[in-house]
C-alpha cells in the first residue's frame, strides 16, 4: 500500500471483489482502519463494513439489527458459507 491518500481512496472505494471471501475483505478492512487511524463509532464501522460486502450478503442481513463489528463479520461469513454450499449442491445436482 502506498501513501495515506492512496490508502484513504482504497478505504472509500472498498468493496468485496468477485473472488474475495469475507475473511480476506475483513482483514483488509481492519488493516486500512488501523493504518488510517479511523476512529468511527462501532455503529458507523458496522455500516461501512456491511456496505463493502457482496449484494447477496447485504440482502440477507438487511433486516438484522447488528451493532457489533464482530457479530456482523460472523453473520457475513455464515451467509457466504451457506451460499457457497447451495452453489456447490446445485452444481453437483446438475452433474447427475
Where are the model-predicted features located?
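Positively charged, low-complexity alpha-helical assembly interface
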Residues: 2-96
Amino acid at each position: 500500500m502506498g501513501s495515506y491518500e492512496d490508502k484513504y481512496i482504497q478505504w472509500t472505494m472498498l468493496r468485496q471483489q468477485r473472488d474475495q471471501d469475507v475473511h480476506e475483505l475483513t482483514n483488509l478492512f481492519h488493516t486500512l482502519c488501523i493504518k488510517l487511524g479511523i476512529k468511527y463509532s462501532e455503529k458507523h464501522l458496522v455500516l461501512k463494513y456491511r456496505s463493502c460486502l457482496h449484494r447477496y450478503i447485504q440482502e440477507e442481513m438487511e433486516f438484522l439489527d447488528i451493532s457489533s463489528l464482530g457479530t456482523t463479520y460472523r453473520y457475513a461469513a455464515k451467509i457466504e458459507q451457506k451460499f457457497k454450499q447451495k452453489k456447490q449442491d446445485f452444481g453437483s445436482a446438475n452433474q447427475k
